[in-house]
Amino acid sequence: MSKNKLSKGQQRRVNANHQRRLKTSKEKPDYDDNLFGEPDEGIVISRFGMHADVESADGDVHRCNIRRTIRSLVTGDRVVWRPGKPAAEGVNVKGIVEAVHERTSVLTRPDFYDGVKPIAANIDQIVIVSAILPELSLNIIDRYLVACETLQIEPIIVLNKIDLLDDEGMKFVNEQMDIYRNIGYRVLMVSSHTQDGLKPLEEALTGRISIFAGQSGVGKSSLLNALLGLQKEILTNDVSDNSGLGQHTTTAARLYHFPHGGDVIDSPGVREFGLWHLEPEQITQGFVEFHDYLGLCKYRDCKHDTDPGCAIREAVEEGKIAETRFENYHRILESMAQVKTRKNFSDTDD
């Protein structure tokens, strides 16, 4: 990170926000301000309960407490933090997070008990990793794409393990990927084993904060290892830093820096995006090629299934919309209805 001290105006706003929150809280201040130095900017590279690892402008990592006035803090957040003074070493903290800058984006996932939970912030793009083995699933890709469209975060589709394809297999896979290329999505074909195709992927990741999504077995960790230049497997629950704080077991998201530039957040929370909390209209909007036909159906309440005069079905029959995408659209709606039914049944049992 480049060194970027707070301006006087930013400092005044941070102080004003902090004081206002303290006044509206019935709790006393949680830490003595005299224990900490001047405010600086940083980025959260991981979060553990009421602690966070914050990377400062000079690249050092500091274990920090979090003010109770901060309601939400996740990996990727840009923050204002203060280092602990030398006299404060006895309290076993390196600093304290004082405030969180406004997010440009937030990656969330639904939770049956806690509603929609944020898991990472300021994401520029989501890299959807799929593979020909154990099975190339366009349905899973389509689910990820709906989530990306709903979150308004740019997706990139990466097909891994292409070294396992013969000429005929490569032709078939390219035909499948053309479905996505033809509707404007970027598709990259790579092999983490032979490193074929990694250069274009590196270029796509440079200067951006990305998060990788993919089911087990698609080689997501191997791909990250190759991009990060690591000799050992990434373990999301193996966290360490250069501040002498040792190892910590966690299931938290973690931010890493690519040697070629750019950052990646590795998180166990994005193996699969749940869509059950969305409305059917949001799923429909998540299929970008449907947009030109919405509002053209004969009936306003058209379900885009067997309804007469459905403009979307007519587009499928005319080859303007891929049939596999249309089928996956209905599979997603059916799976959503099933999950919501189970959730409602569970709620009535409580």
Curated annotation (Swiss-Prot):
EC number: 3.6.1.-
SUPFAM superfamilies hit by this protein: P-loop containing nucleoside triphosphate hydrolases
Cofactor note: Binds 1 zinc ion per subunit.
Domain of life: Bacteria
Keyword GTP-binding: yes
Region (Disordered): 1-33
GO CC terms: cytoplasm
Protein name: Small ribosomal subunit biogenesis GTPase RsgA
Cofactor: Zn(2+)
Gene giving rise to this polypeptide: rsgA
Binding-site residues for GTP, renumbered to this chain: 160-163, 214-222
InterPro entries membership: G_CP_dom, NA-bd_OB-fold, P-loop_NTPase, Ribosome_biogen_GTPase_RsgA, RsgA_GTPase_dom
Location(s) in or outside the cell: Cytoplasm
Amino acids binding Zn(2+): 297, 302, 304, 310
Keyword annotations of the record: Cytoplasm, GTP-binding, Hydrolase, Metal-binding, Nucleotide-binding, Ribosome biogenesis, RNA-binding, rRNA-binding, Zinc
Role, per record: One of several proteins that assist in the late maturation steps of the functional core of the 30S ribosomal subunit. Helps release RbfA from mature subunits. May play a role in the assembly of ribosomal proteins into the subunit. Circularly permuted GTPase that catalyzes slow GTP hydrolysis, GTPase activity is stimulated by the 30S ribosomal subunit.
